[in-house]
Amino acid sequence: GDLPIAFPAFMECVKMGMPIKHIRPTHVGRHPEVFAQAIAFTKAGGYIDITTSGGNYMGSAADAFVMALEEGAPIDRITFSSDGHGSMPRFDKNGEMIGLTVCKVSDNLKMLQELAGKIGLEKALLPLTRTIATALCLGNKGVIEAGKDADLLVMDKDLKPLHLFMKGRQVMKDSEVIVKGAFEE
């Protein structure tokens, strides 16, 4: 978030014995001082999360990711999340909150499309695949290997979803969801 005092508190926890891998700061792109501390946190071995649903002082989440890399953050210590379906404040031109909107999971895809144009698709996929799976200790996720969950998204040349498989089961075909959950129509 916006609290510059958060990272010193995190590092005190680490000094007292808490494994740095269990501390997961998010919304780290909202304030320049917080962002600088977040980059230092990655260099100490921690993970940071950049929110794709807006709120990054330097622009988009892709801009924040590139800036973090330029400042020396290890690429395998940065994850993305959308705060999918969480509430997000809306502000007027004077910075006054005027209401709420909803964060969209699709912001992750928009960020991937933007970031791929900046650093290439292979690197752009990392914060949404291998890095987040590793950070969350999800050993069967994040990579395509024998013996792992067969989660696979097939996209077209414009990085728009065509087919999706979850644990080997096709749930999207030709850009249409074919398997729905209990709360979907």
Language-model features: locations:
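Short secondary-structure boundary/hinge segments and terminal tails
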Residues: 6, 58-59, 132-133, 151, ...
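Active-site core of metal-dependent hydrolases
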Residues: 1-91, 96-102
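His/Asp/Glu-enriched, well-ordered alpha-helical/loop segment
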Residues: 70-146, 152
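C-terminal cap of metal-dependent C-N hydrolases
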Residues: 144-185
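Proline- and acidic/polar-enriched loop/turn elements at helix boundaries
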Residues: 1, 53, 126-127, 145, ...
